[in-house]
Amino acid sequence: MEIENIVANTVYIKARESGGQKKGKSKKWKNYLQFPHYTECLPLKTEIEVTYAFVVEKQPIGKLLFHEFCQATNSQYHQCCQFLTKVEEYETSDDDGQSRRDLASSIVSLLHSKPEDNPSGSQDEQEFWCSFLSDEVISTCITTADSATHDDEPRSDIFTEPYRLTCQYLTDAPFKEFAESMYFHRFLQWKWLEKRPVDKHTFRLYRVLGKGGFGEVCACQVRASGKMYALKKLEKKRVKKRHAETLSLNEKQILQRINSPFVVSLAYAYETKDALCLVLTLMNGGDLKFHLYNLMPGGFDEKRVQFYAAEITLGLQHLHSERILYRDLKPENILLDDFGHVRISDLGLAVEIKDNEPIKGRVGTVGYMAPEIVKNERYSYGVDWWGVGCLIYEMIEGKAPFRQRKEKVKREEVERRVREDQEKYSEKFSEAARTLCRGLLHKEPGFRLGCRRVGRPEDGAEEIRAHPFFNTADTVTGREPVPWKKMEAGKVTPPFCPDPRAVYAKDVLDIEQFSTVKGVRLDATDTQFYGKFNTGCVSIPWQSEMIETECFAELNTFHDEDGNVMWNLRPDGINMDERRNGTSKPGFFSRLFRKKNIEVTKSLHDLSHLGVEQQQPPKTSTQTPAVRSSRAASASGRTLVI
C-alpha cells in the first residue's frame, strides 16, 4: 500500500517538474495548436469587441501582438508602447527608492527626446513621438519627476496623465491600422484555437489531491502546453441527487468572471460521461490549515501573518469589486502556490449581491460565520471581513477565536460564543494585531472594520489596508509596512516557500472514496444544464498559459524560412494547403499499397516481352487517395494521440 502512494507521488512530482521546465508538452503539441487560414477566423470579429480596451488592455495575447505590430510598422507607435511599458514597470517596481528614481529618470529622458536631438536623422526618425501631448503636460510631468528623484520614496502616480493620453492616442489611428493588419488576423487565429472544444483527452491525469463536495480533486496536465492544473470533478448523479445544479453553475460562472492573482482561476470547464469538470489553478503548497496545525503548531510569526492577511485582503477586494460575497473564509480554503503566495479557493458558497441589497441565508462554517449570519439576519460584505478577523486571530494564536481545534462542543454553543463572548488575546498579539482583530471581530456590522465607510463595496478593503498593522513597522515582530503596489504585482517575496519535492496532501489511500450514487437517472433536462457548464477554455487564463509555457513565442511566426508571409496569413494561402481542397497527403499504407500495385503492373508488361500471353492489369480502385489513406489508417488501428 505504501508503494502505491510512493509511485503516485513520484509520478506527480516528475510531472510538476516537467511542466515547470516547459518539457511536459506532448510530442505532437504543434499539431494540436495548428493555426487555420485566417479567413476561417474572420467570423469571430462579430463575437468580440474590436476595440483597444478589449483587445489590447484585456487580452494578454492581444497586447503582445499589438506591440509587435507597432514595433514592425511605425517607430512612433513603437515608442509609445515602450513608454507605456516603462510606466507600468515604474508603478510596480521595488519600493526601495533608488530603483524607482532611476526608472523615473529613464522615463523622463523619453519625454526629453525631441526631434532636434537627432538632426542627422530622417524625417520619420525626427518625429517627436509624443507630439500628441501638450507642452504643459510634459513640463509638469518632467518637473514632478525631477523633484521625485530627490525623494526617499517617489510617488507612483507621476506619469498617470501622460500614460492615459498615450493610451488614448493609440486607441485611434494605431489600433485601426492594427485591426486591418495580419497581426490582428493572427490574434483571431489564437481566438479560434481558444474556442475549440475541450474534453478529457486534452489532459493527462495524476494522483488524487483531495475531496470536494461532489467528487475528487486530482492533478492534471495539459498535453499541448505541459501546464499543470487541479481538476475538480462534480459527479453528475451526486449533483442531481443533492439538487445542486444551481450551486455548481453559480460557482463555475463566478470563477469564470474573476481574474485575480489572489483567487484561484478557472482555466477550462468541460464534461465527461459521468462528471462535470472544473480545471483550476494548481496550488502545490497545500492549505493554511495543514501548515498551521501540522508544520507550525502554535501559530505563525506576525510577519508571515501580515503577508497572508494582505494577499487575502486583496483577493476579497477583487471579489467585492465584482459584487461577489465569498462567505466561507477559513484556513482550509486558503491555498499556497509553489512560491508561497496564497489564493482564495472553493467559491461554492459565493454569491453575487445585486444593487447592493443585503441578503439572507445561514451558510458558512461553524465558528467562522459572522453574528448576523448566526442570527439569520440580512447581511452584506461585512461577513467577509469578520472571516478575515477569525483567520488572522487563528494564524497568530494557533486556534480559532470561538472554538479550539477538535473541541467537542455543540453547534449551538459555538454560535452562542460568536453572538455573546469576547475573544481573548494572549501575549502573542502585538498592539497593532490586537486592535486589527478587535476591529474586524466587532459584533455589530456597522462598527466593524471594513464596514464603516459608505461607498463602493471594494472601499472596505481600503479601510483595512490603512490600518497600522499593515502600514507601520515593528522592530519586535519584524513587521514592516506593506508595499501594496508591489504586492498587487506579485513582486513581494513570500516569507515561506514550499519544498518543491514535497507533496502537501494526504496519502492517496487516506483520502476517502465516494460511495456509488444509486437511484438517480440523468435525462434530457440534465443535458441542457450540462450545455451551460461545458464552455471549454476561459480566455485570459488560457492565453496566459500559452505565453507562460512559451507556446506563443514558438508558434507566433509571421514568415517562413524563405522570408515569405506564412501561408495561413496570405489571402491566396488557402489554396496552398492540401487539406483545404479535399485531398490529404497519402498515408504510409496508402503509399505502400500503391507501390505494390505499380510493381505488379510492371511485371505483367515484362512477361509480354517474353512471348507470354498479355494479362489484363487489375482494375484501379476508384477510391480517392483521401479515402484510401483513411481506410488504410483505420485498418492499421492507429489513433492520433496528442
Curated annotation (Swiss-Prot):
One of its GO terms (biological process) is regulation of signal transduction. Pfam families: Pkinase (PF00069), RGS (PF00615). GO terms for molecular function: ATP binding; G protein-coupled receptor kinase activity; protein kinase activity. Residues 203-470 form the Protein kinase domain. InterPro entries: AGC-kinase_C, GPCR_kinase, Kinase-like_dom_sf, Prot_kinase_dom, Protein_kinase_ATP_BS, RGS, RGS_sf, RGS_subdomain_2. It catalyses: [G-protein-coupled receptor] + ATP = [G-protein-coupled receptor]-phosphate + ADP + H(+). PROSITE patterns: AGC_KINASE_CTER, PROTEIN_KINASE_ATP, PROTEIN_KINASE_DOM, PROTEIN_KINASE_ST, RGS. Keywords: ATP-binding, Kinase, Nucleotide-binding, Phosphoprotein, Serine/threonine-protein kinase, Transferase. It comes from the Eukaryota. The active site is at residue 328. Residues 480-545 form the AGC-kinase C-terminal domain. Specifically phosphorylates the activated forms of G protein-coupled receptors. This is G protein-coupled receptor kinase 1.
